[in-house]
């Protein structure tokens, strides 16, 4: 209806590639999720074609989708922890096995926390979530 506002929260491709530290363990799954996710620019085009005005995008880099558990590096080795993010379902069995092997190796050498911090650093710039809103014309 004219004047109505739609708000959509989603992850941009940049956020999917750089906003989640553990995604770096499953690079093929990142590409699969990007294929299934509408980037904000494409979303704006679709909304415009559907009769909406200019789409505005907002990112709050302080939002962490998994709250404090996101920063528990060894959580990646726990199936319950992994069930908190659907990207793991897109990892092929061999990719998951490789990822868990790498995470175990990093944990055993005391480097898992460092891996997490290194790969989490871009999140402060790109965030994890984009809020897109547009008004129906």
Q: Where does each model-flagged region fall?
A:
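Conserved class I S-adenosyl-L-methionine
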Residues: 5-38, 64-69
């Amino acid at each position: 209806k004219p004047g109505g506002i739609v708000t959509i929260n989603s992850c941009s491709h940049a956020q999917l590639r750089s906003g989640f530290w553990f995604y770096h363990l499953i690079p093929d799954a990142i590409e699969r999720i990007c294929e299934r996710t509408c980037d904000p620019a494409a979303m704006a085009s679709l909304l415009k074609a559907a009769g909406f005005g200019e789409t505005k995008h907002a990112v709050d880099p302080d939002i962490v989708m998994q709250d404090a558990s996101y920063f528990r590096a060894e959580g990646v080795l726990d199936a319950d922890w992994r069930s908190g993010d659907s990207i793991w379902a897109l990892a092929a069995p061999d990719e998951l096995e490789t990822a868990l092997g790498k995470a175990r190796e990093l944990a055993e050498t005391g480097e898992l926390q460092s891996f997490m911090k290194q790969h989490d650093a871009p999140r402060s710039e790109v965030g994890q979530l984009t809020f897109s809103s547009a008004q129906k014309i």
